[in-house]
Curated annotation (Swiss-Prot):
One Pfam family recorded for the sequence: Glycos_transf_2
Cofactor(s) needed for function: Mg(2+); Mn(2+); Ca(2+)
General function of this protein: Transfers mannose from GDP-mannose to dolichol monophosphate to form dolichol phosphate mannose (Dol-P-Man) which is the mannosyl donor in pathways leading to N-glycosylation, glycosyl phosphatidylinositol membrane anchoring, and O-mannosylation of proteins; catalytic subunit of the dolichol-phosphate mannose (DPM) synthase complex.
InterPro entries (alphabetical): DPM1-like (IPR039528), Glyco_trans_2-like (IPR001173), Nucleotide-diphossugar_trans (IPR029044)
Keywords on record: Endoplasmic reticulum, Glycosyltransferase, Magnesium, Manganese, Metal-binding, Transferase
Localization per record: Endoplasmic reticulum
Protein name according to UniProt: Dolichol-phosphate mannosyltransferase subunit 1
Residues the record lists as binding Mg(2+): 113
GO BP term, pick one: dolichol-linked oligosaccharide biosynthetic process
Length: 254
């Protein structure tokens, strides 16, 4: 680990009161949003965790923005912040825009479709404090983790894709494509700025860059549940595209 990153780590440990910003990019999540917000509120408040949720809404045609506004009235503007964008502008830009509205010193990235249960967030925080690390990522591929709602084909393709990416890129984590993660805010900003990938490979490059820069990453086993409402966007074409993008990342990453 570089001297700079070691000094960064020691300065972060001096913070006595942490606040966690949860960034939720949304597109057509009308049914899921009220449930995930309720779960976040329930799980974090019972652990006395200081938090806020930033909903980054990409002009959903199903009324997701209106639902978000109703939730803001229920939970309050201090807990629920809304950023309305003109359309789908990419995951990286959604995270960066969410960071700009955040007031926390730590940022949690997760999906709004109920694939990621907020009950794991306290475990992420506990792991971070135990290791004093800059990043914690959820993993489906360690003991205690798993996937529910996927057929055998999808499980196998996910495993194979992760294995190929791990062999080529040696990122030091067991679940490269997961998007349920805790970052120190300044670290997240730096990684996103350097990230050149799109789609599912965006998450892969985040871990590869983190490893290159000497950041420590903790892992917490999670159970991933396929979305209840709405349609999953993953298909065989995207899997092929993912593998091509991983190869491109391997050839070009500096």
């Amino acid at each position: 680990m570089s001297t700079k990153n070691r000094s960064d780590k020691s300065s972060s440990s001096s913070i006595t009161k942490d606040k966690y910003t949860i960034i939720l990019p949304t597109y057509k999540e009308r049914e899921n949003l009220p449930i995930i917000i309720w779960l976040i509120s329930t799980e974090l408040e019972k652990c006395f965790i200081d938090y806020e949720v930033v909903i980054v809404e990409d002009n959903s045609p199903d009324g997701t923005l209106e639902v978000a506004q109703q939730l803001q009235k229920i939970y309050g503007e201090e807990k629920i912040k809304i950023l309305s964008r003109p359309g789908k502008m990419g995951l990286g830009s959604a995270y960066m825009d969410g960071i700009k509205k955040s007031t926390g010193n730590w940022v949690i990235l997760m999906d709004a479709d109920l694939s990621h249960h907020p009950k794991f967030i306290p475990q992420f925080i506990e792991k971070q404090k135990k290791l004093n690390c800059e990043i914690v990522t959820g993993t489906r591929y360690q003991s205690g983790g798993g996937v529910f709602g996927w057929n055998l084909y999808r499980k196998l393709t996910s495993r194979v894709a992760n294995y190929i990416a791990s062999v080529l890129l040696t990122p030091g984590v067991s679940d490269l494509t997961g998007s349920f993660r805790l970052y120190r805010k300044d670290v997240l900003e730096k990684l996103i700025t350097q990230n050149k990938s799109k789609g599912y490979v965006f998450q892969v490059e985040m871990m590869v860059r983190a490893n290159q820069l000497g950041y420590q990453v903790g892992e917490v086993p999670i159970t991933f549940v396929d979305r209840i409402f709405g349609v999953s966007n993953l298909d065989s074409g995207e899997i092929v595209g993912f593998l091509k993008s991983v190869l491109n990342l391997f050839m070009n990453i500096e």
